[in-house]
């Protein structure tokens, strides 16, 4: 179980995340939503251990993650929003490197890498440099690297970015399958339709603070709104989206 308790992050006096508290449980897919600048990415970086909170605590299975950060990271798989990869390596070389850095046993890891490359339709390009890969192919490499060590906690930051329709459907089903097998899955995305299809529980962030933390079904009932998009718009969108779209259309036609 992943627990955030009163987590706050300040940069030079500016509060990026303010008193965030929520729980992501095994077997459950938790959606973490918010507009740009709301603090989602900062929260994800704190959960991965890349940065430390200014206040509050993050626990996994009851233990503060900073107590044994290396051990915690061995149990975590992370797909970041931006695919920063070693472009001079091939997809196969990159995954071998990830396995070695994690001290995974060579033979079973090689078999697992081969299987992941085949199932993600990368096997034919496994010897090509990542610099020649499309964005979707790079995303598949990141997904493979995040799952290579069979992590207990899976953090996904815009994981569908760049994926073709078929791979997107596979990933959607895979996320559900991993949760069903007892993984803790935290899923951050701007694609509310996918979140609504995949997640049972959502946390919505606005102006660095949580404005909703509930099941999607209960939020629908509570707010008397039929879709997650409408719920999100009411809680976290301050702009007149229709009015702005009309102004843009008027401007380009003037």
Regions found by a protein language model. Name each.
Residues 213-214:
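ABC ATPase "signature
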Residues 96, 100, 107-125:
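Conserved ABC ATPase "signature" region
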Residues 195-196:
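A short, surface-exposed alpha-helical micro-motif characterized by mixed small hydrophobic
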């Amino acid at each position: 179980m992943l627990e955030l308790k009163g987590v706050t992050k300040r940069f030079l006096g500016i509060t990026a995340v303010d008193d965030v508290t929520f729980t992501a449980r095994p077997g459950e897919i938790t959606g973490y939503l918010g507009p740009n600048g709301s603090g989602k990415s900062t929260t994800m970086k704190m959960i991965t251990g890349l940065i430390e909170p200014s206040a509050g605590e993050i626990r996994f299975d009851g233990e503060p993650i900073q107590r044994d950060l290396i051990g915690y990271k061995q149990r975590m798989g992370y797909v970041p929003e931006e695919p920063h990869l070693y472009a001079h390596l091939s997809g196969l070389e990159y995954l071998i490197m990830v396995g070695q850095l994690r001290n995974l046993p060579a033979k079973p890891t090689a078999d697992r890498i081969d299987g992941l490359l085949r199932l993600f339709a990368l096997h034919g390009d496994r010897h090509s440099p990542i610099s020649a890969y499309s964005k979707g192919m790079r995303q598949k490499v990141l997904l493979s690297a995040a799952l290579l060590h069979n992590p207990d906690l899976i953090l996904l930051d815009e994981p569908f970015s760049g994926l073709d329709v078929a791979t997107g459907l596979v990933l959607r089903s895979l996320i559900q399958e991993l949760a069903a097998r007892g993984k803790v899955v935290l899923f951050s995305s701007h694609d509310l339709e996918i979140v609504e299809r995949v997640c049972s529980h959502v946390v919505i962030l606005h102006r660095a603070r949580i404005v909703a933390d509930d099941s999607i079904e209960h939020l629908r009932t509570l707010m008397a709104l039929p879709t997650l998009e409408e719920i999100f718009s009411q809680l976290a969108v301050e702009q007149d989206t229709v009015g702005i779209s009309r102004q843009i259309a008027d401007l380009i036609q003037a």
